Amino acid sequence: MTRTSHALATSEGVWLVDPVDWPAAIDRATSLGTPLGVIQLLDRHNRDNAAIAERLGVPLLVVPESLPGTPFDVIEIKRAKRWREVALWWPEQRTLVVAEALATNRFFPIGDDLVGVHPVLRLTPPRRLRTYEPEHLLVGHGEGVHGRDATVALHEALGRSRLSVVRWAASVPFRMWRKPTRPPGGG
């Protein structure tokens, strides 16, 4: 599955979000300004966060409830025993960063959608994200979506999430009764 890191450059410095320890990416991120911290948005996204934070001499903030002194608002996505996730909203830049609940890789979107809800969350998508109209939607798996498409893609993914489960469930009986195709060459 595609893993994506983000560097959010503010006037004070750079925040690394769920970074992967790839030297070229870390160098590029730190070239944007003084590193201020590493933010881990999903409890399972341990990745290389601790090692990067230690190497850069900055704090590691794991699924923070708030980020005082930063331009970011923290949005709770899910708080359960096995899934703790928050998202970041940067109002000045109209940037929404979501670690896992939304993605653009080939596993999450349905049909021609740019963005999809994580399959486990499709019945209970993070609807509180509907109130946001991002100019930039950054995800933990896949490429970001920018411009007007970001808000449209976000709202479509959230709006179609439950319907996608219904479509899948409705197709199960047909797939169960469908005869398997023969392998090439008979047999």
Residue ranges and their predicted role:
Residues 10-12, 35-38, 57-60, 115-118, ...:
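Short, low-complexity, polar/charged sequence segments that are solvent-exposed and flexible
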Residues 1-37:
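Pre-active-site segment of Zn-dependent metallo-hydrolases
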Residues 1-4, 23-28, 46-49, 82-85, ...:
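A generic local structural motif
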